Amino acid sequence: MATIEACDFFPYTVLSRSQWKSLRKASSLPINEQELEQLVGLNEPITLNEVADIYVPLAELLHVHATAYQRLQQQKRGFFHHGKNRSPFIIGLAGSVAVGKSTTARLLQKLLKAWPEHHHVDLVTTDGFLYPNETLEARGLMDKKGFPESYDLPALIRFLSDVKAGEPYVKAPVYSHLTYNIVEGDYQVVHEPDIVIVEGINVLQVNKRNHHIPNVFVSDFFDFSIYVDAKEEQILQWYIERFKLLQNTAFQDPNSYFHRFRHLSEVEAEQFATSIWKNINGVNLHENILPTKHRADLVLQKGPHHFIDEVKLRNI
């Protein structure tokens, strides 16, 4: 039996890895080893067994929610006697830098596409709604990149509002991790999806400084939300490992914003990454990201090697 744990006034059903694994219904995997390699991050050794044990049951749970949502929307259209555009099921996915949000989002997108009821699944990251570096520099916010004030929240909320309203073509700005900046004139077009996954560190934050659109928050548009969690010391280690791997890959590109760090020694690289964590990412985690964890419908608790140790499902 699952145990019940009260987490900051939010009761969760806490399932161990074995309990969660036992919920899986599917007998086959809609993904192979080669496809998995293309989806996982640099230092995330996720296996097909991990996909089968953790991510397939999660996709099955999301399928239950998404199809129930679709039926409700259909019944509402019938009740009001109009052919209103279909409103997609929106999943919010939050968590710290380097915790593995992007891999989780890509895996869920791949798995959810396997159902004919919702084969069109779009993935949008909130990185595209960061202000351009030029704007951040002018406002003295480059060291606050990733903090709530570094995002164009009104634009993100307008985007989500249009998507949720069923607008047929909605554009999202594109962010380049190579240049560490918004790609001017480039957009991702969201066209009548069944499901949209919105991934970003900030998606569950309630930013009370947003005076342009009062009392409206990014999470208001979510039908289900997920928080990917791990101990901070583990996340820091993953962050350092990723930085070192990028030194030998992306940082070698002359167009990379971090090209100047490619020749740091191993000790220097670890010291630099640790400093960035302590002064920026760790501060953001404690001030803005971690406090939102218990607003999520489901928490994936990671242990070593990005393997999930337990799953917490909110009851209210």
From Swiss-Prot:
Instruction: Write down any Gene Ontology CC term.
Output: cytoplasm
Keyword ATP-binding among UniProt keywords: yes
Q: Which top EC class is given?
A: transferase
Q: Where does ATP bind?
A: G95, S96, V97, A98, V99, G100, K101, S102
Recite the UniProt keywords alphabetically.
ATP-binding, Coenzyme A biosynthesis, Cytoplasm, Kinase, Nucleotide-binding, Transferase
Query: Which GO terms of the molecular function aspect are on file?
Result: ATP binding; pantothenate kinase activity
Which reactions does this protein catalyse? (R)-pantothenate + ATP = (R)-4'-phosphopantothenate + ADP + H(+)
**GO BP, one example?**
coenzyme A biosynthetic process
Recorded E.C. number(s)?
A: 2.7.1.33
Question: What's the main place this protein lives?
Answer: cytoplasm
Matching Gene3D superfamilies, A to Z? P-loop containing nucleotide triphosphate hydrolases (3.40.50.300)
Q: Where in the cell is it found?
A: Cytoplasm
Which family, according to the similarity comment? Answer: Belongs to the prokaryotic pantothenate kinase family.
List the protein's name. Answer: Pantothenate kinase
Q: Which gene encodes it?
A: coaA
